[in-house]
Amino acid sequence: MKRVTFVAADLSTGGGVNKVIRDLAVLFKQTLGADVTVVNARSDRPSTYRFPSDVPVPQHRRQSLLSYFRLLLRLRKASPDFVTSSWTQDNILVVLAFLFSRTKTIVVEHSSWHFHSWAIRLLRRIVYPLASSVVVLNRRDLDHYRAYLSDVRLIPDPVTVPSLPPEQREKLIIAVGHLSPLKNFEDAIRAMAMSGLEKDGWSLAIIGSGRSEPDLRGLVEELGLTRTRLHPSQVDLASWYARASLLLVTSRLESFSLVLAEAMLSGVVPIAYASDGPSFILEDFPEHLVKLGDVDALARRLVRFASGPDAEPLRRALRASIQSRFAPDIVVEQWRELLEAPCR
């Protein structure tokens, strides 16, 4: 039985990456028969996403960088067969901590290659070749890392949503994520205003929390929108997916976009800025991609899909695309191939 250690920074913060860590840990345990431990390395608060009882999740208090590295060295002494991490800075430290050990290091890059500062990119350029494998989530990142890595693989996130009884689709547009400048919800609000869809009974719900909330609320008021509202973050988005007709993804950077894939699986029609992740997920649906920052085009696309003909054939095609590429049983087999590959 292979022993796999997942290193997570802070499982209490929610978000797509932590959900993927939980889902992969469960898949490794239940499908691959691995002995899995998930280390909550920099938080002693409970995980947002529940883990089964047979997957231990040891907690560690938030600590200095030096103490964190010492923790990684202690994990090294346990000699797992594989260790995997998911954030760039953590990836760098994990590779260094396990260097020259018998443990195979697999780092998953959840940030687009051009996201970080030059200093972090330089460290990554030096350290990532020392990892056993690097996993990326879209084709553009794959092309970038192939230039200097001998073992880089495209393995997307597994995508699932709870099954709910079908509901009548509402005149509802949703946008989901942390309320930060990077997620760029200002463009979603401006596109809603430019589209004029509120006068036809359409609503925009922005679901999330973060420091941009006051500015976003101010923009809604400034533009005179009465059917556009902000809602608190929610762990389970299934009920929103079941009701919504359209999804807006306006992030400046996305290496994958779990929300986009989950919404498509639920039959929500997406409109997304063409950053790396959405471009990969929607590669068979280019008409749903909009040039970054083009709010006029975003508004026009909203009107087009809000007023289009029966969307059920499109919804079925969107679901089928996600099921055929990102279903857990497909993704876990790609991981099985990686775990069973000869060690470097």
Model-derived features with residue positions:
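Short His-centered aromatic/hydrophobic patch
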Residues: 85-91, 109
